[in-house]
Amino acid sequence: REAVDQVLRGHEPYPALAVDRHWNLVSYNRAVPPLLAGVSAELLVPPVNVMHLSLHPQGLAPRILNLAQWREHAFARLRQQIAACADPQLEALLESLQRYPAPVRSAAPIEAAMVVPLQIESPAGVLSLIGTTTVFGTPVDVTLSELALETFFPADETTATALRSLYAQHATA
């Protein structure tokens, strides 16, 4: 667990979090809390499910500018996991998420993309983030094999500057 926290801290001032195989939040770095401003307190009661947090109407969803694209990306990731392991808990999670109101789609079709940026409103303005997922390749501890690190990088210099500012404000608060 210390190795996970070390990687998360090393990613600061950019947001990073660790989730279990069911997308429950295990740990996060100090760059994450400022991005959760305005989220319903109910969604932040452990166990916090990151998929629910991002797609729930009282979660991050109202602030995600490309919600239709981000939602489809999240669903595709869940479908891949379900195809690989047929986990009933993941199937139930997907069904639950699909009951949330679908965002109005733009006229342009949503194309499958290797990288789907997360475009989200924040206290520092609009952020454009590119996410990566990391898993431990040779875990000695079985619990590490069930963790994934979700790290977000700025997609542009404006976002990088805003994230550094948010982090500095939060770290000194």
Predicted regions and their residues:
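Short, charged amphipathic alpha-helical "coupling" segments at sensory-output junctions
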Residues: R1-E2
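PAS-family sensory domains
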Residues: Q6-V7, E12-P103, E111, A173
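Low-complexity, glycine/alanine/valine/leucine- and proline-rich hydrophobic stretches
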Residues: A108-T172
